[in-house]
Amino acid sequence: MTEREEFLDIFHRYVTRPGSEKLLDWLDTKTDFFTAPASTRFHGAYDGGLCAHSLNVYRVLRSSFFEPDTDTEETYAIVALLHDLCKANFYKKGTRNVKNDETGKWEKVSSYSVEDMFPYGHGEKSVFLIERFMKLKVEEAVAIRWHMGGFDDAVRGGSFAMSGAFEKYPLAVKLHISDLEATYLMETR
């Protein structure tokens, strides 16, 4: 099973709320989500890296934190698979020059650059894009909004809202931890 097929299988199996099929159709036909990288030069910086990263976050979140008595499969699938939706149609493929240490000559290599057509932030942009098609529960929206934790620009700018979000919504902490584990412990840089 390809990563795209696995993503679609999990999504179809667990995400059933109104609008989910329209969201998935948009994701599949109007974005590069399944072929986009997860970053420009670090984790998942390859074609399909975004989908692979989303699946890794899902695996960590599901295996480390899921409590069948209190959690729902749908919520876990939504927040993990869609937390980085903001990165769809976000990167542009190109080339850059790199000096070959052996020959001393400059060579063109494939690269990615950011081309943000809708500069709306990171987590908040993912929430906005999802809610164009389907409603999120408050805990889902908060978890996706703050999944970057201390790396979020608002936190670096001095906002204390993340602390309140983490105290009130444990799912936000769990998603952040899962994202960190997937990024720094599972994925090659």
Can you describe what each PLM-predicted range is?
Residues 1, 188-189:
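C-terminal end-of-chain micro-motif
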Residues 1-36:
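Non-catalytic interface/linker regions that flank or bridge core catalytic/transmembrane domains
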Residues 23-30, 43-55:
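All-alpha helical catalytic cores of prenyl diphosphate-utilizing isoprenoid enzymes
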Residues 39-40, 44, 52, 59, ...:
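Divalent metal-dependent catalytic cores for phosphoryl transfer on phosphate-bearing substrates
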